[in-house]
């Protein structure tokens, strides 16, 4: 059964919109490199609710299973992405779940 991997981000104040675009363009391209990643969506919060924590963006990745998330975590392309872009965010939340209706 598919698993959704959500990443909610609060970027550092000094990160520009151009840098954020670069961040997301590079991250979305990981789906072409890491077989475990089946689909990726990202976006910016469009409401003004719950802004006190400063989170502004979200990424949603689809994996085939919990086990394939582990393949993604240790994949050299994912590790390399983190090495380059870790300094962009002030904090993030990660949540993995199995969708239900």
UniProtKB/Swiss-Prot annotation:
It comes from the Eukaryota. Its EC number is 4.4.1.26. GO terms for cellular component: cytoplasm. 3,5,7-trioxododecanoyl-CoA binds at residues 5, 72. Residues 3-97 form the Stress-response A/B barrel domain. Expressed in glandular trichomes and at lower levels in female flowers. Changing residue 59 to M: Slightly reduced activity. Pathway: Secondary metabolite biosynthesis; terpenoid biosynthesis. It catalyses: 3,5,7-trioxododecanoyl-CoA = olivetolate + CoA + H(+). Mg(2+) binds at residues 31, 34, 37. It is found in: Cytoplasm. The active site is at 72 (acid/base catalyst), 75 (acid/base catalyst). It is an enzyme of class 4 (lyase). Coiled coil: none annotated. GO terms for molecular function: cyclase activity; lyase activity; metal ion binding. GO terms for biological process: cannabinoid biosynthetic process; olivetolic acid biosynthetic process; pollen tube adhesion; terpenoid biosynthetic process. Involved in the biosynthesis of cannabinoids-related terpenophenolic natural products, which have pharmacological activity. Polyketide cyclase which functions in concert with OLS/TKS to form olivetolic acid. Has no intrinsic polyketide synthase activity and requires the presence of OLS to produce olivetolic acid. This is Olivetolic acid cyclase. It comes from Cannabis sativa (Hemp).
């Amino acid at each position: 059964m598919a698993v959704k991997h959500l990443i909610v981000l609060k970027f550092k104040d000094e990160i520009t919109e151009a840098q954020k675009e670069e961040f997301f363009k590079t991250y979305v391209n990981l789906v072409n490199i890491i077989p475990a990643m089946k689909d990726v969506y990202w976006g910016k919060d469009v409401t003004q609710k719950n802004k006190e924590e400063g989170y502004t963006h979200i990424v949603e990745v689809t994996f085939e299973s919990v086990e394939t998330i582990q393949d993604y975590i240790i994949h050299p392309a994912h590790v390399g992405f983190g090495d380059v872009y870790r300094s962009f965010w002030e904090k993030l939340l990660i949540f993995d779940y199995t969708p239900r209706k």
